[in-house]
Curated annotation (Swiss-Prot):
CDD domains: TRX_Fd_NuoE. This is NADH-quinone oxidoreductase subunit E. It holds the Pfam family 2Fe-2S_thioredx. It comes from Buchnera aphidicola subsp. Acyrthosiphon pisum (strain APS). Belongs to the complex I 24 kDa subunit family. GO terms for molecular function: 2 iron, 2 sulfur cluster binding; metal ion binding; NADH dehydrogenase activity; quinone binding. The gene is nuoE. Keywords: 2Fe-2S, Iron, Iron-sulfur, Metal-binding, NAD, Quinone, Translocase. NDH-1 shuttles electrons from NADH, via FMN and iron-sulfur (Fe-S) centers, to quinones in the respiratory chain. Couples the redox reaction to proton translocation (for every two electrons transferred, four hydrogen ions are translocated across the cytoplasmic membrane), and thus conserves the redox energy in a proton gradient. NCBIfam families: nuoE_fam, PRK07539.1-2. [2Fe-2S] cluster binds at residues 88, 93, 129, 133.
């Protein structure tokens, strides 16, 4: 990660929320995941500039914040669509047919894994497990979980998300 020379500012709301977390932790590095979630909730993703701003508030090295951001798949390091589709690509969902669901999603959305639709409506991401192994294949759209899917069910499901 290159050092960013452009001055970037978090909002007062973001700063206050991050500062509020300090009372719960002795080691401020432990706050980095919460700080990343605070920034992402407001902005939709976490830029390099935000990484440096978080590190400054927490008085830690930016590489520590970057390490946390890149480790957690729920932290987005580039802009994403309004609706995040996560499909489970675990062994169990493989056995229950996730590949057919993945293909149906890609065909309907006209994007590949990791891409966002041209209208910024959807981003398609694989995840290792959604914890719904007895009901696979499973996807999540934002915070909503859908199980026992068929390729034919994908169009009507996606149409309900604007």
């Amino acid at each position: 990660m290159q050092e960013i020379s452009i001055k970037f500012k978090l909002t007062n709301e973001e700063i206050n929320a991050i500062e509020n977390q300090k009372k719960y932790y002795e080691d401020f590095r432990a706050i980095s995941i919460e700080a990343l979630k605070i920034v992402q909730k407001k902005r939709g993703w976490v830029s390099d500039q935000a990484i440096y701003a978080i590190a400054e508030i927490l008085h830690i090295n930016p590489s520590d914040v970057e390490g946390v951001a890149t480790f957690y798949s729920q932290i987005f390091r580039k802009p994403v669509g309004r609706n995040i589709i996560r499909y489970c690509d675990s062994v169990v969902c493989f056995l229950t047919g996730y590949k057919r669901i993945q293909i149906a999603l890609e065909n309907y959305l006209k994007i590949k894994i990791g891409e966002t639709t041209k209208d910024d409506r959807f981003t398609l991401l694989p995840v290792c497990c959604l914890g719904n192994c007895d009901k696979g294949p499973t996807i999540m759209i934002n915070e909503d979980t859908y199980s026992v899917l068929t390729p034919e069910s994908i169009p009507s499901l996606l149409e309900s998300y604007k």
